[in-house]
Amino acid sequence: MFWRDITLSVWRKKTTGLKTKKRLLPLVLAAALCSSPVWAEEATFTANFKDTDLKSFIETVGANLNKTIIMGPGVQGKVSIRTMTPLNERQYYQLFLNLLEAQGYAVVPMENDVLKVVKSSAAKVEPLPLVGEGSDNYAGDEMVTKVVPVRNVSVRELAPILRQMIDSAGSGNVVNYDPSNVIMLTGRASVVERLTEVIQRVDHAGNRTEEVIPLDNASASEIARVLESLTKNSGENQPATLKSQIVADERTNSVIVSGDPATRDKMRRLIRRLDSEMERSGNSQVFYLKYSKAEDLVDVLKQVSGTLTAAKEEAEGTVGSGREIVSIAASKHSNALIVTAPQDIMQSLQSVIEQLDIRRAQVHVEALIVEVAEGSNINFGVQWASKDAGLMQFANGTQIPIGTLGAAISQAKPQKGSTVISENGATTINPDTNGDLSTLAQLLSGFSGTAVGVVKGDWMALVQAVKNDSSSNVLSTPSITTLDNQEAFFMVGQDVPVLTGSTVGSNNSNPFNTVERKKVGIMLKVTPQINEGNAVQMVIEQEVSKVEGQTSLDVVFGERKLKTTVLANDGELIVLGGLMDDQAGESVAKVPLLGDIPLIGNLFKSTADKKEKRNLMVFIRPTILRDGMAADGVSQRKYNYMRAEQIYRDEQGLSLMPHTAQPVLPAQNQALPPEVRAFLNAGRTR
């Protein structure tokens, strides 16, 4: 310890203070004369001050204790004290703190043997020492901070009481921290220790224990509700630590009671009276369902009741006795369930019904079918024919065979009448007949392009040329809304008759035809399932079909079909699949050798070139509609879009009937957004 240097420090103070502070000389001499010799094991002090300036007193104590003192200019006051017995260093330091406390000041120990003198009210924000349990290093008026854990009492309720016991000078402070249930005390060590002792005496758990009371007939939740209602008013003026607590355990059908022995005994007797066996014949209840269909829940509830009955009989040792009879029936017209069961099983079934009879979320599914196609066909050919020399004809591409064309032209020419005289002199006059144009008309009906015929004597040449360009851009957006886990089907198209068989009678007249109808158009079938969060799993079947044309046998259909299962987030656009098709081909029919001659060879051949390109993509986007507000928002957007289209067409009018009004959807109430209107409508129905 540094106390062996006290005498030297005091004499050094006396030597340096003779010139500037003569009035301190008696005090310094008194302190020096009252101190023990240098070789003493422990220094002792006596104090004799009368109307001494407070700053001088502080400086004297700092010199005696070999401490550096920091104090502001506002420190002022007078000190008068006289000790009758010698004081050791700790007693001397406590005397110093007591005198400062009486003057409204406190000492904050700093590093390097520095003492800081501050106002008592400002000491609580200084870096005070943090003490723990059983610490003896600080006592008296030393400023400290202590954290006290509280185990059985709420610090929120205890803190206001402790604040009333803090000194009035404002040097102390009490802060409670609810998450850890601890109290932080700041102030003089003696006050902090006194508050700690108060906390320890108050912080007792009391004679409270928990008791589990199993039930035989009643429902645990119902019994707990009744007991809570009975004890609610009677325990209003009791502290929280003395109030009884009642909790229902649905899993074991038991009631847990916490409190003192008298309270638990009272609750036990009351529970036994309430847990009496009821008449089983009249234990029936009707449950009116809000969202589910009663017929769909009957099978589920029968399975659940069977499991509950078996478990109860096994627990009671009455397996197979048939004592527990459960009956579940559905009323289709009122959408209600009629359940007859013992009370405990009835409560379990009621809980299951409440969890199943909930409003299921809906999913609005939008599909986007995009098809962009373009094609180009070019056909050029020359055919020759001679009545006597033969012919050169081609049938590739869109060429009309020259032989078939010549025969059709011959049939189309009118025939001039003739006069025939028989051997017996009879005269027969045949009238003029018109030509048959049906063959020629049928032949030309399927032709497009240019056909030029050149006739020279017995020779005829047919030159045909055609170019076809096609382009298409198709966007189909079928959409449908369905419940979660509910299959939905959407179809827009037509029924096309298809000949599947024909039976001819014995006289080969009036054949019997068998016709089936095939649906063509846009079809969407989807079953959504809402998963954890906002993910939607969808089982999708999508088809686009149309009539492509007709052959000599039957109708040709074009189909684009897709079947898959995907997972998408709410509002996310996901591609299901697609096709990118690019085709190019050429067909050449020619006369050998002659068709290979440059330039001239084109007179002896027919060429058909074809190029087609098609891009097909299918997208889908699910939107979860968890409540009426979301459903109304989607419906209003669709409704307003269709109404805007109708208003636009009505403004355009009909060219030949300009004054004819066209149908337009009625206007909706646009004063409020659809979400707000849905919320207000839901409130009116409550």
Swiss-Prot record:
One of its GO terms (cellular component) is type II protein secretion system complex. Pfam families: Secretin, Secretin_N, type_II_gspD_N0. Residues 282-357 are annotated as: N3. It comes from the Bacteria. It is found in: Cell outer membrane. This is Secretin GspD 2. The record marks 493 as: May serve as a pivot that allows opening of the central gate for substrate egress. Residues 414-433 are annotated as: Cap gate. The gene is gspD2. Belongs to the bacterial secretin family. GSP D subfamily. NCBIfam families: type_II_gspD. Residues 360-627 are annotated as: Secretin. Residues 629-686 are annotated as: S domain, contacts AspS2. Residues 207-279 are annotated as: N2. Residues 1-40 form the signal peptide. Residues 142-206 are annotated as: N1. Encoded in a type II secretion system (T2SS-beta); this strain encodes 2 T2SS but only this one (beta) is expressed under standard laboratory conditions. The N0 region interacts in the periplasm with GspC. The S domain interacts with pilotin AspS2. The N0, N1, N2 and N3 domains are periplasmic, while the secretin and S domains form a channel that is partially inserted in the outer membrane. The cap gate extends out on the extracellular side of the channel partially closing the channel. The secretin domain forms a double beta-barrel structure; the outer barrel has an outer diameter of about 110 Angstroms while the inner barrel forms the central gate with a small pore in the closed state. Disruption phenotype: Severely disrupts assembly and function of T2SS-beta. Part of a type II secretion system (T2SS, formerly general secretion pathway, GSP) for the export of folded proteins across the outer membrane. This subunit forms the outer membrane channel.
